[in-house]
Amino acid sequence: MAKEKISPGMQQYLDIKKNYPDAFLLFRMGDFYELFYDDAVKAAQILEISLTSRNKNADNPIPMAGVPYHSAQAYIDVLVEMGYKVAIAEQMEDPKQAVGVVKREVVQVITPGTVVDSSKPDSANNFLVAIDKVGSRFGLSYMDVSTGEFFATELDDFSSVCSEIQNLKAREVVVGYDLLETDEQVLVNQLNLLLSKETEGYDDVHLIGNSLTDLESSVASKLLQYVHRTQMRELSHLQKAQHYEIKDYLQMSYATKSSLDLLENARTGKKHGSLFWLLDKTKTAMGMRLLRTWIDRPLVNQASIIERQNIIQVFLDNFFERSDLTESLKGVYDIERLASRVSFGKANPKDLIQLGHTLAQVPIIKAILESFNDDALSGLLQELDALPELESLIRSAIDPDAPATITEGGIIRDGFDETLDKYRKVMSEGTSWIADIEAKEREASGITTLKIDYNRKDGYYFHVTNSNLSLVPDHFFRKATLKNSERFGTAELAKIEGEMLEAREKSSTLEYDIFMRVREQVERYIDRLQSLAKAIATVDVLQSLAVTAETNHYVRPVFNDEHRIAIDRGRHAVVEKVMGVQEYIPNTITFDSQTNIQLITGPNMSGKSTYMRQLALSVVMAQMGAYVPADSVDLPVFDAIYTRIGAADDLISGQSTFMVEMMEANQAIKRATPNSLIIFDELGRGTATYDGMALAQSIIEFIHDKVGAKTMFATHYHELTALSNSLTHLVNVHVATLEKDGEVTFLHKIVDGPADKSYGIHVAKIAGLPTDLLNRADTILTQLEGETVVIQPQEKVSSQEKPAIETHVNEQISLFDDFTENPVLQELRDLDIYNMTPMQVMMAVADLKQKL
């Protein structure tokens, strides 16, 4: 389309749009936000709104779609939720005063990582992440624009970056360096992230400070630059970037957290059925967010853990006071989000009223905490700043019945501003004067139905029906003629109306100005409000953990430095809650200081996975400061939990079950320390039997000899139980069963020693497989059990003297009439797996599989 054929208004649109090619441009035109060209076509499909055209009679009509400005937020939410950016172009001058095209500018770009306003409020954090790279090191910074939280760290490799992004549940990543194509594919295709480029930094000494490393400062400044470039305003609520290190917390990958159902149920993706669901008895949005953080990042500093435990104990010891505290927290609104709305200049009267109500609750909360009379609460009490001067300002300035908008009036309390009160008096007395005029003229004219009405076009007028027109006084002048009546005015009525309209206009302007000044004063308190929010959130989380501990009969864990695990009659917190206390069978877990590995055998569906998850959840709960479901708990402080639980293929990246198993095993073996916890469930089942058994044995021995981490290893390879003869730090345990009259009952109880049967056929029977099939399986099993697999004991790991799996066939069966040993077996025996990395083992096994 030739440029000369484009109207000035559309040229303005195109000039703005070229600066935001990756965003939907919402172009304000009167009472609507309009979209044009491809934006209109796509938005019409996504939002299910009408697609029209701006110039229907032209050869190439311009596609157009629009949404009302007063309901635009809901449409913006849909676009952003689907991963799009939305640029908002507002009218920057009154169209009535404009000369030519109304001036318009983009005032904000809303992206998935920068959502502040939403028609669907969510108490969860919405983190925007930035990544940068110098040499082989990665910098990562993240921020919640809606709360002001701001952090930065350094990471060793790209896999750690991806894991942290997943842990943060980020939807958008700002990239500050040239990504490798393969890395970009991982972020976009596997992690489903929106990527934005930012190569410039935003220099702000107040927010970046000097506590960060150079790389952390670089990535944090690029994140800050992106936020300022999209939000286009000063954001006084942003907090100073805080340095953190992954090792400061109990390290867990996203896959580990998912397999343990920490924040959501892995099967449903919902909160219900997760540890978060179980522990969440918070009463505030801030408390809920902080609880998620505590679950997501348990502590490794024992003193900090005990500090939390001490406060929970105080709450447990004072039931009635705690109940009062819980009740008082219900009156607390989301201070962090309210502060951000003030900073964005979007806080309305209702927001300030909520803030005022919250501040009024603080002295009550503080008094209750003081009534506990315990030194454990002294730190929290110091942080509970009630801000009485701010509470007084809001209470005296804002009418408690004020509307949500700032243009309708009725915002400021009577008595707050003398001039405003005068205008209101004129309006109030004017109404009384009008009533007096109406009564006077009704009596003088004899028109019994005479009344004064008002509309925006005619102002105040006397309404006279046609039947009474002959009685209209001479000093009335006609303002409008209708079918059945006429409207009249008088000089006296016009004078009163003029005074009232002037007072109303001045009152409205003054009230708006007063509200803006009050909001500016509130903004000065943002730092103190954010500190108060953190203190209240901490109180809320600790009372929530106390309530959960009391309700579910949890105990306070203790910690030791001898690498002992002693959990007496422990329970899986979530499974117990779902099943009911009466149905759940507790299990004792014991690792003395010399025991590092429990090799767990037993039938499928018998409770092996629950038993292992029980330990992992107990560690998470203990190190976040919570109490634990058991009769007693004594644990070391772990630095990390590594898991391989479940056998789902990674279909997105094309990785098989076996590949995923080996990669997760490799991560554990490479990174675990003697202070780590490893949970491996049926490792090796993703490949052929002997491949899997060989790898399982080699991994067990590697952990035993070189890693030394506390490990639970569940396996269906019963032959591996013989390892207890050669590995001094390994013990066998199994799930007990009861056989009676041919029926098998799983007791869900862990006992010492190896299992003697797998009971797989019994599980198949429970699943409902046909009887004929089960009988045939039983026959085949009897024949197969004639084979024995002997794992040679190992006294020393070396390339000259290493264990090997040898198969001795004691009985030929019909399934294998022509059995001959495959030469690949000898190659397998020759593998020097004890001097190979897990990844090398995996590649070697893959090569051998190709030869089969």
UniProtKB/Swiss-Prot annotation:
InterPro entries: DNA_mismatch_repair_MutS, DNA_mismatch_repair_MutS-lik_N, DNA_mismatch_repair_MutS/MSH, DNA_mismatch_repair_MutS_C, DNA_mismatch_repair_MutS_clamp, DNA_mismatch_repair_MutS_core, DNA_mismatch_repair_MutS_N, DNA_mismatch_repair_MutS_sf. Pfam families: MutS_I (PF01624), MutS_II (PF05188), MutS_III (PF05192), MutS_IV (PF05190), MutS_V (PF00488). Keywords: ATP-binding, DNA damage, DNA repair, DNA-binding, Nucleotide-binding. One of its GO terms (biological process) is mismatch repair. GO terms for cellular component: cytosol. GO terms for molecular function: ATP binding; ATP-dependent DNA damage sensor activity; damaged DNA binding; mismatched DNA binding. The keyword DNA-binding applies. ATP binds at G602, P603, N604, M605, S606, G607, K608, S609. SMART domains: MUTSac, MUTSd. Gene3D superfamilies: 1.10.1420.10, DNA repair protein MutS, domain I, MutS, connector domain, P-loop containing nucleotide triphosphate hydrolases. The keyword DNA-binding applies. Belongs to the DNA mismatch repair MutS family. This protein is involved in the repair of mismatches in DNA. It is possible that it carries out the mismatch recognition step. This protein has a weak ATPase activity. This is DNA mismatch repair protein MutS. It comes from Streptococcus thermophilus (strain ATCC BAA-491 / LMD-9).
